[in-house]
A protein has these predicted regions:
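Acyl-donor (CoA/ACP) binding surface of acyl/acetyltransferases
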Residues: 1-21, 56-174
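A short helix-loop-beta-strand connector motif used in the catalytic cores of GNAT acetyltransferases and
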Residues: 43-56, 65
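Conserved GNAT-fold acetyl-CoA-binding loop/helix
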Residues: 22-43
Length: 174
């Protein structure tokens, strides 16, 4: 697995992956966002917005997904990842998250990174729980962040958080 800066050349492959019914449904994407043009707009957005750090996830030379830190502030950010369905359950999510979280905590020096998912997206919530360094269901502690992701998704969500110290302690054990 390797992470690369976004490039408009990846739009066609990105569109093919987000067009997969299971991926489109899990992300709650409208039809116009899974087109090649929609992928180009996404790439433009994440490469021009200073409050985002986004990378294309590759296996060799094959685009398999995207990982993004969004709403980056002095202390926190939100992380989101998606993979093409054929890459689910193969460890790519954990590997990509570890790399981007290391950047968030070691380079950006954030204190916490939020991860969340729609409550119906059991697969994503289970994947987050499996990481070991995630504190699950913290919406009551961070209600504004929970409201933010629920406004974006338009549905009930579960908010989780990765605290810098927990992540770095887990990495040190490896």
């Amino acid at each position: 697995m390797n992470l690369r800066e976004h490039d408009e050349r990846y739009a066609e492959a990105m569109s093919a992956l987000t067009s997969q019914p299971a991926v489109k449904e899990a992300l709650g994407l409208p039809d116009d966002m899974v087109t090649v043009e929609g992928a180009k707009k996404f790439i433009w957005h994440v490469t021009t917005d200073e409050r985002q750090y986004s990378r294309a996830i590759f296996d060799g030379d094959t685009l398999i997904g995207v990982i993004t830190l969004k709403d980056i502030s002095a202390e926190s950010a939100h992380i989101g990842t998606w993979l093409g369905e054929q890459y689910w359950g193969l460890g790519y999510n954990e590997e990509a998250k570890s790399a981007v979280l290391a950047y968030a905590f070691n380079v950006l020096e954030l204190k916490r990174v939020f991860a969340g998912a729609a409550k119906r997206n059991i697969r994503s919530l289970k994947a987050q729980e499996k990481l070991g360094y995630v504190t699950m269901d913290v919406g009551k502690r961070y209600p504004i962040d929970l409201i933010t992701i629920e406004k974006i998704t338009g549905e009930p969500c579960q908010l989780n958080v990765i605290l810098r110290d927990n992540f770095l302690a887990q990495v040190a054990k490896r």
